Amino acid sequence: MSLPRIALDAMGGDVGVRVMIDGAAEARRRHDRFKFLLVGDETRIKAALDTHPNMRGASEILHCEDVVGGDEKPTQALRRAKTTSMGLTVNAVKQGEAGAAVSAGNTGALMAMSKLALRTMPGIDRPALAGVMPTLEEDDVVMLDLGANTEADARNLVQFAIMGAAYSRILTGREEPRVRLLNIGTEEIKGTDALRDAAAQLQDAAGLAMQFDGFVESDKINRGQVDVVVTDGFSGNIALKAIEGAARFVTDLLRNAFTSSIRSKVGFLVSRPATELLKHHLDPNNHNGAVFLGLNGVVVKSHGSANSVGVANAVAVAASLLENDLTARIASDLAELGERMWDATGGNGNGPAPK
């Protein structure tokens, strides 16, 4: 099965052109169906491509030297959307020159450019940034929003739940993913009005392709008891950074412990297979690729410091969403929900509104 090519912002992120191209080549080694539109400085891209013969005939270069800065405000970046590698990468999806966009650049700028170029889907007020994290079980957990919206009302949270469940079905194959709202407790009286209202709407709605299980606390996110965790972008980003920090802390703690004495070094050699498995499980590069859900197109955000394996995984996420037509799945779920939950006469003109 052929795939639409993937537009890759070769200039975005902290790692440079070579790592981005190495990642694209690694993705193509895994799946030779992948083809790319590489956006960035042609001279630097060609130099990086010289070591990857598998990219010959599978990539086209769109020359661009201008880059969105890591600390650049979204409003400033938008004014340069037609001249920057990030803007041209997203525009390739809008123009049908690519099926998906992947960038490791400034998250706020990428969201702003994507929303302006691709617009939000009917029935969705705000896009959300969704990522996956490891759990104690086989399947990863989807979490959104991870920072696209610092605030979210009940309507937004319900929409996030629908989008997150559609994404989880692609990842896990589970027809009715277990969905919970992130809260400070699991009791019905806990949390903000928005959380309680969203919970009531999800609990009462019929026809949702999910199993809504109420609230979840942050210490249970990675236990394997939930498939989708829904929250506003402010809380979601804090939770994500806390989990990533805890993972690094555990990794560093083990490294220090295993190098503290001769005996501990011997112990490391004995336990190395287990520790390598733990390291692999906690490595963010193995879970790289957050998705802007709710847009009329596929846009994937790679971590700015991702290595070539991480970039390859972000490309794989984009390809999976194209293969499984995530946008159409979300649209179908929203349409199926219909009058059972929304008052079609309300809202802001961008979709139905909650009763």
From Swiss-Prot:
It catalyses: a fatty acyl-[ACP] + phosphate = an acyl phosphate + holo-[ACP]. It is an enzyme of class 2 (transferase). Gene3D superfamilies: Isopropylmalate Dehydrogenase. Keywords: Cytoplasm, Lipid biosynthesis, Lipid metabolism, Phospholipid biosynthesis, Phospholipid metabolism, Transferase. GO terms for molecular function: phosphate:acyl-[acyl carrier protein] acyltransferase activity. Its EC number is 2.3.1.274. Belongs to the PlsX family. This is Phosphate acyltransferase. It comes from Erythrobacter litoralis (strain HTCC2594).
